[in-house]
Amino acid sequence: MAAASSNGLVVPAAFPPPVNPVEEFVGPPTDPEEVRFEVGVVIVGGGPAGLACANRLLQLLAEDEALTERLGEVPVAVVEKGKVCGAHNLSGAIMRPSAMNELFPDVAPSDWPTYGEVPGEAVYLMLTGKQSVRIPTPPPFKNHGNYVISVAELSRWLADKAEKAGAYLLTETSAAKLLVDHNKVVGIRSGDKGRGKDGEPLGNFEPGSDVLAKATVLAEGTWGHLTGAAIRAFDLGTEDSQVWALGVKEVWEVPTPLTKVIHTLGWPLRTAAKYKEFGGSWIYPMGDDKVSIGFVAGLDYADVEFSVHDVLQQFKTHPQIRGILEGGKRIAWGAKAIPEGGYWAMPKLAAPGVVIAGDSGGMVNVPELKGIHYAMHSGILAAEHIYGQLKANSSDFSSYDAAVHDSVIGKDMFRTRNMKQPFSKGFFVGGAIVNAMVATKGRLPGGHWKTHPDKDQPMFRGGRAKGYPKPDGNYTFDKLSSVYISGNETRDDAPNHIRVQKEVPRELAEMWQWMCPAGVYEVPEDAEGDGPVDVIVNYTNCVQCGAITAKGGRLTAPEGGDGPLYQIT
C-alpha cells in the first residue's frame, strides 16, 4: 500500500481504487451476431449534449433518405442509465439561448421549458454569518438575455423532441463497456440487470447486450464511466488533469417571489490559502413560488471535514438567506460534480468511431458558471460531423475536435483558460489575479497555469465541522433525508458500483464520509484510534454525483434505473 505524503499528511491518490478501466471496460463484442443490437449511431447519455446530438442528427437524416436507409431500422439510439432522460441531470441553472436558437429556430423561446428570462441580478460578498455587502456585478456574472431553467426538465423536453423525430430511447440502461474492434470503437455493451449484491444472477436476471453502431457519442456528463475508459484506451488525455467542483442544490417553495438572480462569494468559505476553499452560491427564481438555491465548492479543498452539503446548510443560516426561504418548504435536493479544469484539461474529443461531447469533454466555463449551451453546441457539432463522415463511409471523426475548438466553446474556454487556478493562492490574491484576467479577456497574466488532480491534495483536520448547524428537519437537513427526496430507489440488493480501497487511514475515511453528500461512506463505530479503517460503503444511497472519482475512488456503471429521479433540478 502506498504511503502518505512526506509531510505526514494523507494524500488520497496514495490509495487508488481497485480498478483497471481499459482491461475491465474496453473490449471486443462478445454476443453472437444474430443477437447483437445494431443501430446507426449510439449516443450514451440522455442529457443536453446527447439529446442535442440526437435531435440535430435526425434533422439531417430527415433530408437524406439514402443514408437513413443505410443506417438501418434504428438510425439513432440514446442509452440513458436513469429511469427517464433527465433523471440524473442537475444544474443551477441559467442557460444562454444560443444553442436552443440554433437547434430549434422555429420554436419561440416562450415555448421552451424555462422559467423565463433573468429578471435582474445581484452579487453579494458575504463578510460573516450575519453581514454582507452588495458588490458591482462582475462581467462573467452578467446574465441579461439568459434563461432560468431546470436542466432535468430541459432534458425531458429534448428527449420528447428526439423521440418524436425517430430516436430510440433506451432508458434504465447503463453503458457498461466500450466495444472496440481493430482499434476502432464499434459501439457499447449495456449492463446486466437483476444481479445480487455479490454479482449472482437473481430470478429476474437479464444479461447486457452488445449495441453495435457506426458511430458512438459519449455524452455521459460530468464523470463519464466510458469516457474515462476511452481516454485511457486511446490516450486522449492532455498534460493537465481534469479537476472538479461539487454542487449541492435544493429547490424551495417560497411565499414571496424572488425578483432577481443572486450569486454570493465569501462566507461560509474560509479565505486562507491553506484551506483551498473555492466556490460560491446561487439563488435563482423559478417562477413566482419557487427558488433554486445551491452551493458549489472545488474538490481540491484540504480540510478532511469539508462538506458541501453542510456548507449549504450553514449558508442558509445567514439572515439574508433566511429572508428568502423562511416560511417556505424544501421540495427537491440533489448533487452533482462539475468539471472545472477548463481549456487546458479538455481531452482530445475524437478517436476512431467515437466522439466526446458536453461535460464529459470538460466543457464548462468556470467564471461564467455556464456549460449547458456548450453541451448542446457540442452535440450539434458532433451530429454534423458524424453525418458528414458517415455519408462518406468514414469513421474518422477527428474534424469534430477541431470544430469544437474553433467554435464558441473553444474560444470562450481559451479566454477563461487560467481563471480557476489562481484561487489556490487564496481568495483575495486569486481574486485580484482573476480580475486582471477578466479585464484583459485572459491575456494578462497569460501563459499556461497548470491544474493538479484533486486527489493529490494533502488532507488535514482543520476544524471545519464545528461551523455546521445541527439539522432541524425543517430548515436545515441531514444527508439521508435529502437522499430520500432525490427519488433514489436503488435496490438494497443491487451490486456495488463504487470502487474504493477498503483499508485506508482514518483521515481518508473521514474525508470521504464528510465529502459525500449522500452519506455513502461511513467509519465503523468500533474503529480504533488513528489506525487503518475498513470503510463501510452504503452504495445504495449513492446519487451518482461523481465526487468520489475526484477524491480517490471511482464510480463504475450502476444497474440501469438505479440512482436519483430528479424532477426539477
Feature-to-residue mapping (PLM):
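Extreme N-terminal leader/targeting segments of oxidoreductases
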Residues: 1-41, 56-75, 195, 482-506, ...
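Glycine-rich Rossmann-fold phosphate-binding loop(s) that bind the pyrophosphate
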Residues: 45-48, 81, 151
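N-terminal FAD cofactor-binding segment of flavoenzymes
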Residues: 56-60, 71-129
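Predominantly flavin-linked oxidoreductase catalytic cores and closely associated redox partners
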Residues: 59, 69-72, 152, 156-157, ...
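Active-site-proximal substrate-binding core of FAD-dependent oxidoreductases
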Residues: 71-74, 87, 362-368, 380, ...
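FAD-binding beta-loop-beta segment adjacent to the flavin cofactor pocket
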Residues: 335-366, 481-493, 503-515, 522
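C-terminal auxiliary extensions adjacent to catalytic cores
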Residues: 423-474
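Iron-sulfur cluster-binding cysteine motifs and their immediate structural context
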Residues: 509-569
